[in-house]
Every structure is written in C-alpha cells, then in structure tokens.
Regions:
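Active-site beta->alpha N-cap acidic-glycine motif
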Residues: 29-123, 127-142, 248
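Weak global preference for isoleucine
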Residues: 8, 13, 18, 63, ...
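Catalytic domains of cell-wall/extracellular-matrix polysaccharide-remodeling enzymes
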Residues: 112-212, 216-234, 245-246, 252-256
C-alpha cells in the first residue's frame, strides 16, 4: 500500500516537472506572435478586414456636390466611374474636387450608348479611350480603374468581354463589378427607403462589399439617403476604402447572360 502511494506521488511530481519545462520553452502568445500567425495561417475561414467600397456610376451630375458633401461630413471615401460626355466645362471643378477630397475616379464610358460602344472591340476602345482622355484633360491623371456599363455580364458585351478584359489588363487597367446594389437606377428617383433596404439586405454577406449606387439627375434620392447608408455601413463595423486599394472583381462567367 505504501509503495503504491509513493508511486502515485512520484508520477504526479514527474507530470508537474514535464508541464513546467514545456511551458518554459513554449513562446508566449504575445500580440506580435498572434499578428504574425494571423497573417500567415492561410486559414480560408479567417475573416478579411471589413472594408466597404462605395461606388457611384454615371457622373458627374448636378447631385455630385451633395454626394461629396455627405462623404466629407461622414469621413467616408468612394470611387466614381465617370461618363465622359457628362464632364462639361461647368463640371470640371467637380471632378477635380473628387480627387482633392481623397476619392478615386475611373472610366465608365464616354457615351453610355450600348449600341455604339459594344458593337465590337474597336468601338469599345474608341469609347473607352475618349472617356479616359477627357478625364486626363481635366485632372492630368490617366485613370486605371474601369467599370462596364450594365456590368461585365450584360448580353451586349458577353461575346467579347474576355478579350476586352485581357486588353485592359495590358494597359494596367483594372475592372470592377459589384456585389451589393442599391438598385437606384431601375426607375426614376427610386424611393429612399427602397435604396436603403437594397443595400442593407446584402451588405453583411461580404467582408469587402462593392456597393453600386448612381450619380445622375434621375437618381436624386441616392444623395438624400447616402448619409443613412454610410451610418449603416459604419454601424456594421466596416471601414471605407477606394477601389484602387482592392483587387479586381468581375462577375463569374457562369452569370453571363
């Protein structure tokens, strides 16, 4: 009986010594160690940084100053995809202001006429380059961001979109679709509550949502509800970024019409 007690006692002492030695030689989980682990773990379940990308198509317009005022007041950034023939002499200062206040700008189209720009590769790049050059004339910058009117999966561009994307990449131009839409251009002045609801229903499905909104005279309610949308995004824990900070995103090929 005594031998058995000593045996059990000895096993306990040995276990304590082994644990102490293991603990002594194991690096502490400092904040630095944790950060390195998170960066290099490669775990696909790991959350990406929550950054939202507000984007506005079809400007500049008469509501662009209101959009910029709201973004400035809310300390949010955005990306504007511009229409070349909307950059009138009177609106040149608006485009300059977009850049001055830390936003990004990209090419949308010059004409926004599908029957002209999507006829073939030649007509597409004529339209693209005309818009790009107009932006350069005003800002001195040749934009590197681009968005296809109606998205990269629309039926007009589908037959040639892969070739267009390849040629754009050779020009160091990056194209972006979206994964959240306010659906603010489906009709004339869509109600504010509808735009807000459309953004809210899909926002949290993504760690890096690209949010499609419009900057045009027929989407005036977008500028009126923008402050509430920005508040919602911030409340959900997102910061705001511009698309020049994000990798390319285009719709999957399976979505093409």
């Amino acid at each position: 009986m005594v031998k058995r007690v000593f045996y059990i006692f000895g096993v306990c002492i040995l276990s304590v010594m082994i644990f102490h030695e293991f603990e002594k030689n194991t690096p502490k989980e400092t904040a630095e160690n944790v950060a390195v682990f998170k960066e290099s773990s490669g775990d696909p379940k790991e959350k990406l940084e929550k950054t939202a990308y507000l984007t506005f198509d079809d400007g500049p317009s008469e509501i662009t100053p209101d959009i910029l005022d709201t973004l400035k007041n809310k300390k949010a950034k955005a990306t504007f995809f511009l229409v070349g023939n909307e950059i009138t002499t009177e609106r040149e200062q608006i485009v300059k202001r977009e850049l001055e206040e830390g936003h990004s700008i990209g090419v949308h189209t010059f004409s926004h006429k599908k029957d002209e720009m999507y006829c073939n590769e030649v007509t597409f790049f004529e339209d693209f380059n005309q818009c790009r050059e107009r932006i350069r004339q005003v800002t001195g910058i040749l934009p590197k961001l681009h968005r296809f009117p109606w998205g990269s999966n629309n039926g007009y561009v589908c037959p040639i979109v892969d070739d267009l994307l390849a040629k754009l990449k050779k020009e160091n131009v990056v194209s972006y679709d979206w994964n959240v839409s306010g659906e603010d251009s489906v009709g004339q002045n869509v109600p504010k509550a509808v735009i807000y609801k459309n953004v809210a229903k899909d926002l949290e499905k993504f760690d890096q949502p690209i949010i499609l909104l419009h900057d045009s005279n027929s989407t005036k309610n977008t500028s009126k509800v923008l402050g509430e949308i920005i508040d919602l995004i911030a409340e959900k824990g997102y910061s705001f970024g511009t698309l020049d900070e994000r990798e390319e995103y285009t719709f999957p090929q399976s979505w093409r019409k």
